[in-house]
Amino acid sequence: MSGEGVSGLLGSGAIVRLLGVRAFEPEAVARAVDGARGLLPEPAQRALAESGLEGLAEAVLLERQFGAHHFAPSPSRRLYYHVRPFLPAKARALLRRGVVSRTVPSDSLHWPIEDRFVSFAERVRAVLEESCSMRTLPWWPSGHSFAVVLTHDVEGPFGLAHLMDVLTVEREAGFRSSVSFVGDAYDVPDSLLRELRAEGFEIALHGWRHDGRDFSSGSLFNQRLPRMNQRLREWQALGFRSPMTHRNPVWMQDLDVTWDSSFFDTDPYEPIPGGVMSVWPYMMGRFAELPYTLPQDHTLIETLGETSPRLWLEKLDFLAAHHGMALVNVHPDYVCRNGRLSMYEEFLEEVTHRAGYWHALPRDVASWTLERWGS
């Protein structure tokens, strides 16, 4: 994998579109950007200085600030996923931490809150509104202040068996979510899909197999691509999230989806760490990218040993204050063990006490993003 083909993927004016400032004169935008550039990380500042806003967009929204080969699997990671099926769970966890996760400099992106691009965006919008007596585009429809999006990845048979436990908690709190199933790992009954659709939930695809190899090479990705697209059609699914958030923004353009959520604003704990720094959705080529912005439940539970939604709620407060998208990914495979579901239940209860949020399914956010992108 490499960064080849990335140039031009976002289209022209991605930063201007994301910030909702297309109605302003380019000269005014340039002045506002110049005044806010110091808020960005050094690699993003260099990209802006060398290649303007198009360079900044690629550095941030396509993660080019981490290098042209950021998405390339290392030899150790390739080996790990070849032997992973034969390893016990504890050995997999140790190897994942020590071998698979590449080291990202501690000063690269902050976690769980990365506020530098957010501050940059807000500064540019504020300066333009103050100097030009015009309004920037709203972040969200109908006067909503921020967005709340709930998603689930079902990794295996245990998660499938306990999925309804999670969804029952959501329904009782008045929420609906998107559920991503692996294409070829376990049987997903048609009756379950019909029930989810009837209840107002969304269905998405969680890769072809949960073996870490969907993106291991271009040839294997292309081999699995037709089957993934076929499963998307069979399930009437519009969205995708890659297992283990392995990703390649160029290859993914061939997926028949309207949205993806394989990227994140910041996460040092994923096999490909880094992040797009954006707490808002944006168009990534032919689909809307909805980065998850709340810490992964696996990280909180298995890695950090958290027993409360404390970090989720801290990040939620930040996202609400900055009109962001609070997109959480919860796995029934993890939260339905050892009484952990109460952690998610408490989180949802706290969300209901917030004011002004837009509770939306990913497909609704994708539609809004496409509409806003063209405004």
Which residues does each predicted region cover?
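Terminal accessory/targeting
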Residues: 1-180, 185-188, 233-234, 250-256, ...
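Glycine-rich phosphate-binding "P-loop"
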Residues: 150-155, 203-219
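Short, solvent-exposed turn/loop segments enriched in Gly/Ser/Thr/Pro and often Arg
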Residues: 181-189, 238-248, 265-266
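Metal-dependent catalytic neighborhoods of phosphoester/phosphodiester hydrolases
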Residues: 191-192, 215-223, 251-253
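Acidic, His- and aromatic-enriched active-site or binding-groove loops in soluble protein domains
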Residues: 200-210, 257-273, 281-283
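Conserved beta-strand positions
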Residues: 205, 242, 328-330
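An active-site-proximal "capping" alpha-helix that borders the catalytic cofactor pocket
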Residues: 221-232
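Conserved residues at the C-terminal ends of beta-strands
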Residues: 243, 263-265, 293, 331
